[in-house]
């Protein structure tokens, strides 16, 4: 069974103690609190040097029946308690490989990167699949990730995994293969404006007939746009399409 050491990779450990300026950390926490107030997503700040949560929002999606303070107290033991063992092993492997990939970028580029994955959280007999996204906030003087922000929402997938590593402004991204234990570089996705409009209107709850009327196109044409959007995004449902388009910042 994995332990906490698997979540904190030695290659990301700073040799020197970061500058724990209380004003900076207080500003970070207040910013995270403000963001948590206006989003449906769970939000947390992780301190990789002290190996603890700096902040955890009170969104019940992430808490698994605990209070935010209880989760802060548990730290990454929370994952050992509430992530199924098979998913824990997946996360440990992902941590090792993702920190290695992060390390390939310089300090400025690291802060433009984010990673998205899907895994289960369990609370007693109840289990839910979440989407987890993580990006650096502060780096140490050595360029190691010191403070990171995590964002949690319900997954649009049916299974765990589906890992993607993105760098803002890049025309490529990487997906992780747990079968091959490697990152695979992929070309960025682009959609035509008509395809994006179909996704936007579908997300708003409009039917194919209503979308056709709004866009002054036939229903068959709307279905054509939707099918091409699905093919480009590699998905099979409108929920997955909207989620993937959002992740890739296409809207």
Regions found by a protein language model. Give the residues of each.
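The N-cap/first-turn positions of alpha helices
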Residues: 194-198
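Sensory/regulatory domains in signal-transduction proteins
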Residues: 46-70, 74-161
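Hydrophobic residues on short alpha-helical segments
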Residues: 199-200, 230
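Recognition helix of helix-turn-helix DNA-binding domains
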Residues: 205-240
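Short, low-complexity N-terminal regulatory "tails/caps" that precede and couple sensory modules
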Residues: 1-22
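Short amphipathic alpha-helical boundary/capping segments
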Residues: 183-191
């Amino acid at each position: 069974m994995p332990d906490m050491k698997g979540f904190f990779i030695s290659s990301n450990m700073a040799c020197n103690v970061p500058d724990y300026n209380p004003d900076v950390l207080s500003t970070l926490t207040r910013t995270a609190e403000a963001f948590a107030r206006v989003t449906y997503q769970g939000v947390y700040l992780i301190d990789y040097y002290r190996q603890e949560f700096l902040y955890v929002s009170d969104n019940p999606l992430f808490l698994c029946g605990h209070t935010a303070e209880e989760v802060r107290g548990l730290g990454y033991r929370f994952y050992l308690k509430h992530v199924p063992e098979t998913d824990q092993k997946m996360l440990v492997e992902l941590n090792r490989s993702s920190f290695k990939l992060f390390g390939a970028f310089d300090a400025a580029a690291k802060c433009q990167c984010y990673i998205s994955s899907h895994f289960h959280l369990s609370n007693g007999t109840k289990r839910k699949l979440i989407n987890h996204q993580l990006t650096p906030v502060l780096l140490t003087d050595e360029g190691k990730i010191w403070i990171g922000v995590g964002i949690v929402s319900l997954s649009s997938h049916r299974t765990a995994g589906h890992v993607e590593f993105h760098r803002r402004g890049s025309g490529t991204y990487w997906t992780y293969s747990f079968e091959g234990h490697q990152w695979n570089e992929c070309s960025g996705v682009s959609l035509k404006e008509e395809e994006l409009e179909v996704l936007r209107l579908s997300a708003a709850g409009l039917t194919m007939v209503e979308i056709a009327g709004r866009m002054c196109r036939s229903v068959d044409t709307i279905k054509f746009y939707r099918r091409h959007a699905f093919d480009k995004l590699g998905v099979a449902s409108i929920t997955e399409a909207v989620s993937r388009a959002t992740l890739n910042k296409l809207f």
